[in-house]
Amino acid sequence: VIGGDECNINEHPFLVLVYYDEYQCGGTLINEEWVLTAAHCDGENMEIHLGMHSKKVPNKDRRRRVPKEKFFCDSSKNYTKWNKDIMLIRLNRPVRKSAHIAPLSLPSSPPSVGSVCRIMGWGTISPTEETYPDVPHCANINLLDYEVCRAAYPELPATSRTLCAGILEGGKDSCGGDSGGPLICNGQFQGIVSWGGDPCAQPHEPGSYTNVFDHLDWIKGIIAGNTDATCPL
């Protein structure tokens, strides 16, 4: 996260750190057995760390899990920058609520442009160098009209199941290593960090976030055991 500060140790009990291959992502615990993240965070040898704050000084209640199952919008794992960048991970065993572990509810209402949104993660804190912090950083950005992202990224289709969020003058943004983490708008879990400008946090180049509300039926279907659930087109 660019332009943020160290998160309060108690404000992110749902935030998970995902390691895969040589990379890291974020993710969100949505109940004791399921994590929601970005499809592009899929990889080999995935590890999911829960109840984390400082990587160097671990919380006593931190837990480590591996995926038992992974679910994508369609079995072919077809996703693009602006479509279906979402993955549900079933943990190999449930986690109990504890001081630093608790799920985040799915949204009960759709996101509204103009909302203030919180981003968080262990991603780089420099837009031009890979400077990964020991603790997660948090920042507040704004939910912008989709057309702002279309102006910045002409390859975006006329409509998509993504949210556009950032600060028009730049300076605050999610960045490399934050992918898969949550976008929390007006207290509701509305987005998943997907992609954005390179370098991060440039003026008029907001980030693109998978719209969680649009995928609720799929998320709830998969969790309920309906593996035929499909994502919206």
From Swiss-Prot:
Domain Peptidase S1, first and last residues per copy: 1-224
Principal location: secreted
Enzyme class (EC, first level): hydrolase
Tissue expression profile of the protein: Expressed by the venom gland.
Glycosylation, residue list: N78
Keywords: Blood coagulation cascade activating toxin, Disulfide bond, Glycoprotein, Hemostasis impairing toxin, Hydrolase, Hypotensive agent, Protease, Secreted, Serine protease, Toxin
Organism: Protobothrops elegans
Stored PANTHER family: KALLIKREIN-1, KALLIKREIN-RELATED
Record CDD domains: Tryp_SPc
Cysteine-cysteine disulfides: C7-C138, C25-C41, C73-C231, C117-C185, C149-C164, C175-C200
One of the record's GO molecular function terms: toxin activity
Stated role: Thrombin-like snake venom serine protease that clots rabbit fibrinogen. Only the beta chain of fibrinogen (FGB) is cleaved, releasing fibrinopeptide B. Human and bovine fibrinogen are unaffected. Also cleaves Met-Lys and Arg-Ser bonds in heat-denatured bovine plasma kininogen to release Lys-bradykinin.
Protein name: Thrombin-like enzyme elegaxobin-2
Quaternary structure, from the entry: Monomer.
Protein family membership: Belongs to the peptidase S1 family. Snake venom subfamily.
